[in-house]
A protein has these predicted regions:
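Extreme N-terminal, non-catalytic leader segments
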Residues: 1-50, 54-71, 104-107
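Conserved catalytic-core segment of NTP-binding enzymes
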Residues: 7-9, 14-16, 148-154, 158, ...
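Short beta-strand/turn micro-motifs at beta-sheet edges
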Residues: 30-31, 109-112, 172-175
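Nucleotide-state-sensitive switch-loop elements of NTP-binding domains
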Residues: 38-42, 65-69, 75-163, 167
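Short strand-loop junctions, especially beta-strand C-caps/beta-turns
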Residues: 47, 125-128, 189
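Loop/helix-junction capping segments adjacent to catalytic residues or to phosphate/diphosphate-binding pockets
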Residues: 53, 132, 192-195
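Short amphipathic alpha-helical segment that frequently serves as the phosphate-/nucleotide-binding helix
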Residues: 53-57, 139, 202
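Short acidic, glycine/serine/threonine-rich loops at helix termini
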Residues: 55, 82-85, 172-173, 198
């Protein structure tokens, strides 16, 4: 019976040491490794209304306070990820701006879609109007445009992606399916729906890792 009791000696100090580790140095299985890329891309998932945007707004602000270059990208058709940083105001979305520029015969520039507040760079991918298109396809189109703008050459320390996890659409699973992110963070609570969503995302991560993917689950925020 005694052997079944976990050793809790110095448990608190070990947790503190782990919490102080750089996210880039922690594998999904807990082993330490070298960062695979200079810019660490972290995707956050969870059911709608669980607090993903609130969590990321605070996380990105604290990272900026620590001197990190942080880009926060809202990948939800509601386009409300960055509103907390901008005092409740919505940023012009990439999809909306791209459509207007295309109709005017102009090209989209980075200054049209990327904004800065409190040291955090932020943008919203956006999505189609209700009943007028596919939200997942809008996400894919948004990232294609970001790649044309040199997304991978912007020299950020961290890029934080805010995704809703209620759907199984491939567009919203882009960071996992295409190995765009190094880590996934889940936001959940004690209700069954949020745990169901978290479990689905973990299953997707496991599936693509079996196919050779490198995305891992960094942790769970309750």
């Amino acid at each position: 019976m005694k052997d079944d009791v976990p050793n809790l000696k110095d448990y608190s100090s070990r947790l503190r040491e782990e919490a102080n580790m750089d996210l880039a140095d922690i594998k999904a299985d807990g082993e330490i490794s070298e960062p695979t890329k200079k810019t660490q891309i972290v995707a956050i998932y969870g059911k709608g209304g669980i607090g993903k945007s609130f969590t990321l707004a605070n996380l990105s602000h604290m990272m900026a306070e620590l001197g990190k270059r942080v880009l926060l990208i809202g990948c939800d058709p509601k386009s409300d990820t960055t509103s907390l940083l901008f005092g409740g105001k919505a940023c012009p979305t990439i999809i909306e701006t791209s459509t207007k520029k295309k109709l005017a015969g102009e090209e989209v520039k980075i200054g049209d879609v990327c904004f800065k507040r409190g040291g955090v760079f932020a943008m919203e991918l956006g999505g189609p109007e209700v009943g007028r298109g596919c939200g997942g396809r809008g996400i894919i189109h948004g990232f294609e445009l970001l790649e044309k703008l040199g997304f991978h050459d912007w020299d950020f320390d961290y890029v934080l992606l805010d995704f809703l996890g209620d759907v199984v659409c491939g567009g919203f699973g882009l960071p996992i399916a295409r190995d765009m992110a190094q880590k996934v963070i889940l936001v959940a609570s004690n209700d069954l729906q949020s745990l169901y969503v978290a479990n689905n995302v973990c299953s997707a991560v496991e599936y693509f890792r079996k196919l050779g993917g490198n995305v891992g689950v960094a942790g769970l925020v309750i």
